[in-house]
């Protein structure tokens, strides 16, 4: 999944863009002259050996995190933030005194860049750095920059300097499309903060924004909070599956993979038992979002959240979800029948399918039908081989090579972080990817892409190179073998590299819309598209080799893996439709027609099909309501777009350079600087309808990978 700092009006937008040829300055010319640095090494080998960094650079100059001189020590965050805040004051004065024109947008973008360069970096360091002092300093920097952003979002003079530009039709008509869109995005961010309102309403909007931030934080913490039950209330033989604390049993998750039906049932009922405080927090969060949306001129929070997306409005989202649900219903029933059959076989006393059953039994069916034990695949997917595979694919599709570069002393936060230079065959160095791939204590468990610095065209004509981090949680190498990936780890690696390429190739003029800073329902398209490449034998065959024997991964093993993913896939997708629909209803018309739990019950029965379990409140564990409020449908829509792009542009030949260049030009190069549907149209050469999106998702469930793979020899 994708991570971007979101600071409101002048903060980073969640958006992604590709490359542009204009505006390459002296930096790129210099790089072209020395395209391959002597410090670069082949990427595959670099990931299959232990890093030598700490030994090689003992006497080198300490550079600071990501090469930022101030960040050689935690105190440097204070220096960096003070520097950014001083620069901000100067830029605000410039923006307010400059006559309206394109220069206004450039100043706003520089203002956004100076704040994001500290905030985005700090956003990453506060969760990923192993040293508490660095994490705390980064947290403080985030708070400080956040406070400044709140002030800027309520600075009337700053707002009016942009309003003067957008109110002058002649001036607006003279702006190029990208500049105009960036100006409108800045204005949109101002207005959702309520700056256009009178003083009293503006204060109310600010107060609501603060309240929403606090409620979001509280709700998020509550989604992971364990529940406990007195020991004597649980059958003795299942207690050992859970943690004990005195007279209580602690339940901290759903135990979805447990083979014992009773363990899964107990975990489901106890972990999802409603908590009154969490329920009140959710109700207040939804109500506050609705009040804020209405205050700034929207009929619902969903209308506000969907502005500028592919879907554009809640009506289109609901049409998409309802049509998808209709198309899936028969397949989902068949999946539940298949699960019921397996449950009856293993547990004849109780064969009714309950919500805690599908994840476990679909796994059992998969294992029985297809021999896809991960340990059979891991030897073919050493990390070095997978990185080499990515390198081959990117080179053939886009003319891009990945080179390992030795980081300077102090540049990385853990000695096993690798630094990659991303180099185009004719355009030179495009940016840097820091690969934080290995497990360590206190490291967050999610796989993520972080923007550390966005690309933009600087005033001197040079291009500010993008810098990103890819964070995974892979096992470390052992004495006898390099790091070996399961098929799902390999797919995740390709997924996150899709985000990274979006960042590298989104070479926009403006930082505000660079790389992955685009609408949510478009942002996952490049990453999901990479999953299709990761599941194609013609691609896998380029790199999957046994780390000891060098033997290629047999074609039938890839075929089995692909076919196994279709087991109960309709039921899995139906579950996502249910979640997305629930999200839309919660953020739709208020006051809600019922309690959040009653709405959950109705929606589950209509859009999923398995019975609601009394005295449970799954919505109180739905953490995505915070970060993806009214936009949870985005993953399904991004997958539909990626599926269409794959089938129409890459299915015949996954290494088609002309299709790769078109993909870069039409979909990656504009980031948030162009309407997402225009990018989709440019790539597909047609305007897809809701029915097209639904058909793309449903046809993926039918794809006979085995036949296709055998035909592709």
UniProtKB/Swiss-Prot annotation:
It catalyses: Release of an N-terminal octapeptide as second stage of processing of some proteins imported into the mitochondrion. It is an enzyme of class 3 (hydrolase). Pfam families: Peptidase_M3. GO terms for cellular component: mitochondrial matrix; mitochondrion. Zn(2+) binds at residues 495, 499, 502. Keywords: Acetylation, Calcium, Cobalt, Disease variant, Hydrolase, Iron, Magnesium, Manganese, Metal-binding, Metalloprotease, Mitochondrion, Primary mitochondrial disease, Protease, Transit peptide, Zinc. The keyword Zinc applies. Its EC number is 3.4.24.59. The keyword Manganese applies. Activity is divalent cation-dependent. It is stimulated by manganese, magnesium or calcium ions and reversibly inhibited by zinc, cobalt and iron. It comes from the Eukaryota. Its main location: mitochondrion. Residues 1-35 form a transit peptide. Its cofactor is Zn(2+). The modification N6-acetyllysine is found at residue 126. Binds 1 zinc ion. GO terms for molecular function: metal ion binding; metalloendopeptidase activity. Cleaves proteins, imported into the mitochondrion, to their mature size. Monomer. Belongs to the peptidase M3 family. This is Mitochondrial intermediate peptidase. The lineage of its organism: Eukaryota, Metazoa, Chordata, Craniata, Vertebrata. The gene is MIPEP.
């Amino acid at each position: 999944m994708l991570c971007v700092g979101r600071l409101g009006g002048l903060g980073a937008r969640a958006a992604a863009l590709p490359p542009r040829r204009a505006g390459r300055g002296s930096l790129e010319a210099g790089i072209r002259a020395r395209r391959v640095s002597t410090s670069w090494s082949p990427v595959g080998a670099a990931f299959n050996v232990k890093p030598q960094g700490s030994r090689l650079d003992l006497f080198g100059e300490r550079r600071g995190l990501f090469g930022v001189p101030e960040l050689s020590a935690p105190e440097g965050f204070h220096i960096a933030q003070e520097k950014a805040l001083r620069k901000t004051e100067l830029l605000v004065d410039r923006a307010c005194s400059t006559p309206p024109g394109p220069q206004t947008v450039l100043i706003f973008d520089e203002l956004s860049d100076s704040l994001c360069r500290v905030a985005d970096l700090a956003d990453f360091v506060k969760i990923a750095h192993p040293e508490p002092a660095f994490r705390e300093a980064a947290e403080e920097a985030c708070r400080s920059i956040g406070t400044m952003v709140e002030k800027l979002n309520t600075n009337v003079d700053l707002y009016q300097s942009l309003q003067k530009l957008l109110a002058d039709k002649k001036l607006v008509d003279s702006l190029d499309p990208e500049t105009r869109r960036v100006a409108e995005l800045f204005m949109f961010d101002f207005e959702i903060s309520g700056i256009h309102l009178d003083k009293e309403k503006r204060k109310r909007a600010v107060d609501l924004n603060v309240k929403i931030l606090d409620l979001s934080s509280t709700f998020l913490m509550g989604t992971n909070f364990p529940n406990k039950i007195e020991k004597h209330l649980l059958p003795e033989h299942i207690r050992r599956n859970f943690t004990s604390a005195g007279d209580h049993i602690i339940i901290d998750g759903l135990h979805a993979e447990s083979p014992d039906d009773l363990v899964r049932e107990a975990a489901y009922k106890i972990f999802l038992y409603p908590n009154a405080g969490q329920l009140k927090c959710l109700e207040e969060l939804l109500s506050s979002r609705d009040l804020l949306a209405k205050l700034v001129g929207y009929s619902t929070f969903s209308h506000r959240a969907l502005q500028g997306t592919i879907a554009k409005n809640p009506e289109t989202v609901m049409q998409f979800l309802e049509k998808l649900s209709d198309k899936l219903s028969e397949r989902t029933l068949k999946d539940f029948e298949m699960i019921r059959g397996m449950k009856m076989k293993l547990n004849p006393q109780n064969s009714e399918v309950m919500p805690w059953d599908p994840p476990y039994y679909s796994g059992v069916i998969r294992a029985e039908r297809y021999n896809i034990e991960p340990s059979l695949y891991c030897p073919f997917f050493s990390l070095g081989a997978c990185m080499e595979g990515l390198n081959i694919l990117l080179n053939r599709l886009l003319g891009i090579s990945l080179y390992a570069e030795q980081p300077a002393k102090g540049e990385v936060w853990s000695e096993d972080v690798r630094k990659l230079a991303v180099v185009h065959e004719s355009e030179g160095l495009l940016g840097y990817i820091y690969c934080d791939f290995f497990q360590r204590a206190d490291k967050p468990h999610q796989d993520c892409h972080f923007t550390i610095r966005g690309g933009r065209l600087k005033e001197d004509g040079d291009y500010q190179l993008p810098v990103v981090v890819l964070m995974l949680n892979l096992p470390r190498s052992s004495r006898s073998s390099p790091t070996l990936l399961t098929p799902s780890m390999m797919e995740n690696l390709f997924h996150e590299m899709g985000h990274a390429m979006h960042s590298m190739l989104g070479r926009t003029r403006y930082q505000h819309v660079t790389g992955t800073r685009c609408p949510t329902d478009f942002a996952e398209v490049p990453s999901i598209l990479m999953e299709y490449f990761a599941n194609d034998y013609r691609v896998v065959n380029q790199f999957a080799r046994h780390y000891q024997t060098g033997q290629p991964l047999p074609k039938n093993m890839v075929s089995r893996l692909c076919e196994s993913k279709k087991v109960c896939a309709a039921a899995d997708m139906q579950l996502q439709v249910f979640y997305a629909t629930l999200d839309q209803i919660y953020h739709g018309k208020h006051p809600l027609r019922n309690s959040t739990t009653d709405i959950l019950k109705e929606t589950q029965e209509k859009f999923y099909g398995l019975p609601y379990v009394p005295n449970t409140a799954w919505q109180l564990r739905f953490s995505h309501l915070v970060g993806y409020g009214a936009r949870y449908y985005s993953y399904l829509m991004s997958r539909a777009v990626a599926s269409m792009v794959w089938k129409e542009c890459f299915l015949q030949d996954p290494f088609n350079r002309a299709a790769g260049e078109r993909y870069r030009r039409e979909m990656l190069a504009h980031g948030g600087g162009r309407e997402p549907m225009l990018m989709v149209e440019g790539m597909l050469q047609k305007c897809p309808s809701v029915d097209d999106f639904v058909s793309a998702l449903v046809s993926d469930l039918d794809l006979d990978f085995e036949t296709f793979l055998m035909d592709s020899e």
